[in-house]
From Swiss-Prot:
Region (Important for interaction with NUMA1): 22-357
TPR repeats: 24-57, 62-95, 102-135, 142-184, 202-235, 242-275, 282-315, 322-355
The gene coding this protein: Gpsm2
Name used for this protein in its record: G-protein-signaling modulator 2
Cleavable signal peptide: none
Keywords: Cell cycle, Cell division, Cell membrane, Cytoplasm, Cytoskeleton, Membrane, Mitosis, Nucleotide-binding, Phosphoprotein, Repeat, TPR repeat, Transport
Amino acid sequence: MEGNLISMREDHSFHVRYRMEASCLELALEGERLCKSGDCRAGVSFFEAAVQVGTEDLKTLSAIYSQLGNAYFYLHDYAKALEYHHHDLTLARTIGDQLGEAKASGNLGNTLKVLGNFDEAIVCCQRHLDISRELNDKVGEARALYNLGNVYHAKGKSFGCPGPQDTGEFPEDVRNALQAAVDLYEENLSLVTALGDRAAQGRAFGNLGNTHYLLGNFRDAVIAHEQRLLIAKEFGDKAAERRAYSNLGNAYIFLGEFETASEYYKKTLLLARQLKDRAVEAQSCYSLGNTYTLLQDYEKAIDYHLKHLAIAQELKDRIGEGRACWSLGNAYTALGNHDQAMHFAEKHLEISREVGDKSGELTARLNLSDLQMVLGLSYSTNNSMMSENIEIDGSLHGAGAKLGRRHSMENLELMKLTPEKVPNWNSEILAKQKPLIAKPSAKLLFVNRLKGKKYKSGSACTKVLQDASNSVDHRAPRSQKKISSDTIGDEGFFDLLRRFQSNRMDDQRCHLQGNCRTTSTAAASATPKLMKAPSVSVVSPNTDEFLDLLASSQSRRLDDQRASFSNLPGLRLTKGNSPSVLERLMTNDKKEPDEDFFDILVKCQGSRLDDQRCAPPSAATKGPTVPDEDFFSLILRSQAKRMDEQRVLLQRDPNRDSEFGLKELLQNNALLEFKHSGK
């Protein structure tokens, strides 16, 4: 009787487990179907429900982890994606599934790349590559090479972009990362070509072209993007075709072939309109506006910048609006329409204040100052020292010859404030005023050079600006407060400069977390309590207790980071039918870690230290209507280079230096002799 009862109980338990297994698998399959249909959020709900039900099948659970990680990655919840891909990796290693371990390592590497943990991502992707080669899995090897190339590309781009350098002018470590990406993409390309995978070839060509572009290899970038364009047309992939046209336009800009670049940007604009992507349409208009600025066709530049402005306003992209107003102000200035230029400069200033763009605010103020000088208006924040009796001589109208197109990016002459379309100034007045009418980009360069320096007083700032000025003023200064040699050195400018510097200092400060006691009595009372315990062990000659304490603390921290089978959600173990699974899990926990584990541990510890460092101020946010590859900075840099080329380098004469050094020595000796004789 008892035997029959035990048998009935076992049968009932089996049926319950069977229903649970079926329920878990059904939920997982429904989640997979929803994710494939594009509804990842609903799919995640079914996968989470499957995990709640649980399963004894480790391979099924591993597949659920992988799908959950991918779904969370698609939803941009990278912390959750990292968690489930880590569970998948742990489980795959536990059951000895090398193929599953390779895939989990690749997924983990992609997630770490997005989070900016590039060194850890490289370790994971390299593990994916090593296992694929061990298994002779060519498809997996190609995918691992592509992922590893993406990590190096992202690492180089991330470390190289914040600086003011030109494309291709990067530090050695950045160039090494980008070159490693090129090598990996080329290896991937040869492998997928042998496999006959045209879609993978297209992706490889696109990324290869982008990396060559960053390295400054613009001809190689053009070749790669042309191949990408060809494959995109084969598949009818309009989005990829549009990206290829845009990338080709960017490359031709830096080759100085502006006409060719404009043709590719027009094709980009056409496809963006076909795809009904308003943000990309605005980006194309913005790029075309800048291209025609480089071609000095300011009428067309204004037309495209106005289109960009309209779409930015439609999409409520204030950053894009500000950039459009800046560009329009420069173009109208070049045409001599200073009233319109003033309008857009004021709008640029207003938007820069609204979005907290201090650099844009400073640039807008300088542009307004320039335009007010041209129009003979008084400066809004201070009394201008420029007279309003400007004489205009009509006989000089049209005397200036229009500059031809320049192909060299080093010698561009753009955004003139006094083009030939404006009635020219009297030659004498023009000679006096022309040095004062500085280009916005030149002034911006000058202020950027001052950014990192400390100024002890306002007078010191004034002296630096006066020495650097090229302005001419024949009036003698009546007081120290009058600064007639440089109209930009006024109080409003210095107020802005001081605020700009203070904000930069605030961005570099560390913010203390938690409640801190600030009173001296509280600090005095708290200090002995805090220092009492460590003072005994540290000061004592016998530091064994301290080292034991440190070792135990470190071991607890390491234990917290270990993966245990009890922490795997959805894993159900029973005494009856899974002793082998439990034994494998326990055996896996007791294994001695290999050298690869310690390499990963060192990198992880290094990244944890990096996470505790003070991050630099974040880069300015870009709006959706401003393209990532914004070459408007090229216009500013070309202006800055022209200013640098006009500087005079003083050559030191060693004979003269020694002569002056001898004179100074003799004078000092004579002074000492005079003092001694007086005594």
